[in-house]
Amino acid sequence: MAKISMINRDLKRKRLAKKFADKRLSLKKVISSYASSYEEKIEASCKLQKLPRDSSPTRLRNRCEISGRPRGVYCKFGLGRNKLREAAMRGDIPGLRKASW
């Protein structure tokens, strides 16, 4: 089980990333646009730098929904490998079964 503070920190980052997503996208469009002038690009990059660090989506970490484990998480299910195996063995996930060959 991950520390509660780490899980809460990640939830805070998700909220901030969602809150500033539109603003961040518009500033990045101005920066990468060929039509905008050099001064506009500099101004947009300064505004982008002043946004909170945690609002960047690259700072997010995929975590298991049940245990909060940061590694070995299957995006399709949102579960860590251990919890996914337990759920599959109980039959909680329809269509998923243990491989056998």
Swiss-Prot record:
Question: What keywords tag this UniProt record?
Answer: Ribonucleoprotein, Ribosomal protein, RNA-binding, rRNA-binding
Q: Which Gene3D superfamilies match?
A: 1.10.287.1480
What species is given as this protein's source? Xylella fastidiosa (strain Temecula1 / ATCC 700964)
Family label: Belongs to the universal ribosomal protein uS14 family.
The UniProt entry's GO CC annotations, sorted and at most eight, read: cytoplasm; small ribosomal subunit
Among the GO biological process terms of this entry, one is:
translation
Instruction: Please identify the protein, giving its name as recorded.
Output: Small ribosomal subunit protein uS14
The portions of this protein that span the membrane are: none
Q: Which gene encodes it?
A: rpsN
